[in-house]
């Protein structure tokens, strides 16, 4: 812990309090200070000008990052018949229905993403208390309940991120790894920001993208100058 403390102090010494950093400089700083023994994720937090207490201002969506997330995504699919075969051909790790539900109930939940066809929701709906707290419950608003299960599997495997505003109106997600080139991270960030712009609630007033902060898994946040965003 002492080594980590010294590292964080060293990182903070490189940052100017209150400064908004151009996105490229912020990403270069994150890559420069990423020296822990494992490959860190590059994470983004976006403060949105919404009131998440109002149901029509909850922002929820998904984005396929053009350069992926830099990790293997395990996908489980609840479906049957021709959809089951299509899901397997698309690369799903586990496909099933009642049998997969029993696996989940037993505590074996080795998935990053769970997808379901609409006809499977009669089974998946019973798993809400297990999947919901883990952020794995399929939802049509983010494309994980769909008739095109093969397409959803392909997107998930390609590095699709899903997000929803928290109680403070903030979106959190990863945009890649510190090993990525800066241009690749910028392209991923651009895709996310563009999609967030399309999801602006009609009832939201004032500034929509209020603040954007970049960080690594073990590092402090760096506030980004939005004028430098690659959009």
Swiss-Prot record:
Coiled coil: none annotated. GO terms for cellular component: cytosolic large ribosomal subunit. It holds the Pfam family Ribosomal_L1. SUPFAM superfamilies: Ribosomal protein L1. GO terms for biological process: regulation of translation; translation. Gene3D superfamilies: 3.30.190.20, 3.40.50.790. InterPro entries: Ribosom_uL1_bac-type, Ribosomal_uL1, Ribosomal_uL1-like, Ribosomal_uL1/biogenesis, Ribosomal_uL1_3-a/b-sand, Ribosomal_uL1_CS. The keyword Membrane does not apply. Keywords: Repressor, Ribonucleoprotein, Ribosomal protein, RNA-binding, rRNA-binding, Translation regulation, tRNA-binding. It comes from the Bacteria. One of its GO terms (molecular function) is rRNA binding. The keyword RNA-binding applies. Belongs to the universal ribosomal protein uL1 family. HAMAP family: Ribosomal_uL1_B (MF_01318_B). Binds directly to 23S rRNA. The L1 stalk is quite mobile in the ribosome, and is involved in E site tRNA release. Part of the 50S ribosomal subunit. This is Large ribosomal subunit protein uL1. The gene is rplA.
């Amino acid at each position: 812990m002492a080594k980590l403390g010294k590292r964080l102090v060293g990182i903070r010494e490189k940052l100017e309090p209150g400064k908004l950093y151009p996105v490229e400089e912020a990403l270069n700083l994150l890559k420069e200070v990423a020296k822990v023994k494992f490959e860190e994720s590059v994470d983004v937090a976006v403060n949105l000008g919404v009131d998440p207490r109002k149901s029509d201002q909850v922002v929820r969506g998904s984005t396929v990052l053009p350069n992926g997330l830099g990790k293997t995504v395990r996908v489980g699919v609840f479906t049957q018949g021709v959809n089951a075969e299509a899901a397997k051909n698309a690369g799903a790790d586990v496909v099933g229905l009642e049998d997969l539900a029993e696996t989940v109930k037993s505590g074996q939940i080795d998935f990053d993403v769970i997808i379901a066809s609409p006809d499977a929701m009669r089974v998946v709906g019973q798993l809400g208390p297990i999947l919901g707290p883990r952020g794995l419950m399929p939802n049509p608003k983010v494309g994980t309940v769909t008739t095109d299960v093969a397409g959803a599997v392909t997107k998930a495997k390609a590095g699709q991120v899903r997000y929803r505003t928290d109680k403070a109106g903030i979106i959190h997600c990863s945009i890649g790894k510190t090993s990525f080139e800066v241009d690749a991270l910028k392209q991923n960030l651009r895709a996310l920001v563009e999609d967030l712009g399309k999801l602006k609630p009609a009832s939201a007033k004032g500034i929509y993208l209020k603040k954007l902060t970049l960080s690594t898994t073990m590092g402090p946040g760096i506030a980004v100058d939005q004028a430098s965003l690659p959009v």
